Design a protein with these regions (language model features):
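Extended recognition/assembly regions associated with phosphoester-bond processing machinery
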Residues: 1-64, 68-293
Length: 293
């Protein structure tokens, strides 16, 4: 898809109005898996769980910007749901409070399809199913968030739509990830050369394309897909933000909007002076007033 097609997607996006009292957190590329050797989130699962519990307790709205579930490596979404049951309990609480929005990415687009959910109706021992969770939750391609006071808008989308190999050739990339790259990466350390998350050249080209589009269209963009954080310090630098991912070594990243300010956040495992481990939250970008963009 040509980058210009983002205009059509943006124009057809659900619009959400927020204000300077709103609290919003964006996560992307969680890649929740089934707990086997191909599960990229497994090493960080307690960091992620601690983070989302913090955001629920502090009354944030949770927006997941694609690739929340890893449906390229794994076929069975119920196995993913069962492995991440504590996580889904928290997400269910967000959902019940109308504080949950999900956007699909290339790795989890299937869960937005009714046909896929109908094929996955198996239940766990608690009589809960992934199908129940997702069939009552709209999965969006994109969202537009509008700041009530400044009228600044943020176009939120996963980003694979302008990545030829992961959009038009998604069927081929999915096959290679499931049967080739996931195994080579797990056992031999190879990195998938077709993915912007694993290829610096692809990522740089992707970032340049998005930055140029955002500038030309005078809009602010929040994406995932590349797994690499981007946080411009002002409009003069860029208006393209990248959330990063939840599958970095011992680290997950997120973007927060609170009190009319936007920040880039890092969650990691830390040790105190006595050697006790805990999950810590650090601001690594911002906070910067939304009006500055």
């Amino acid at each position: 898809m040509k980058v210009e097609k983002l205009n059509d997607i943006k124009n057809n996006s659900k619009e959400i109005i927020f204000n300077s009292n709103s609290k919003i957190v964006f996560f992307s590329d969680c890649h929740r898996g089934d707990g086997t050797y191909k599960d990229s989130l497994a090493p960080n699962i307690n960091i992620y769980l601690s983070a989302i519990r913090y955001y629920y307790k502090n009354k944030f709205t949770y927006i997941e910007v694609g690739d929340g579930d890893e449906l390229w490596k794994f076929k069975d979404i119920q196995e993913i749901y069962d492995m991440n049951y504590e996580i889904y309990e928290v997400l269910e609480e967000f959902k019940e409070k109308n504080r949950l929005y999900m956007i699909y990415g290339n790795h989890d687009k299937d869960k937005s399809k009714i046909k896929f959910l109908r094929k996955n109706k198996r239940r766990n021992r608690f009589n809960h199913s992934a199908s129940d969770f997702y069939s009552t939750l709209e999965i969006y391609e994109s969202l537009v968030l509008v700041h009530e006071e400044s009228k600044k808008d943020f176009f939120v989308i996963h980003g694979h739509q302008i990545d030829f190999l992961n959009n038009e050739l998604a069927f081929l990339s999915k096959f290679l990830v499931r049967y080739v790259w996931a195994i080579l990466e797990a056992f031999m350390g190879f990195k998938d050369p077709t993915s912007p998350a694993k290829s610096n050249n692809k990522r740089n080209l992707f970032d340049e394309k998005i930055s140029r589009w955002a500038e030309e269209n005078k809009t602010r963009v929040i994406l995932g897909h590349t797994h690499k954080t981007l946080f411009p310090k002002s409009r003069n630098e860029s208006t393209y933000f990248n959330i990063g991912c939840c599958v970095l070594p011992r680290t997950i990243t997120a973007i927060e909007i609170e009190r009319g300010e936007i920040s880039l956040i890092k969650w990691t495992i830390k040790a105190d002076e006595k050697g006790s481990l805990f999950v810590g939250r650090d601001i690594i970008g911002g906070p910067i007033r939304i009006e500055n963009y």
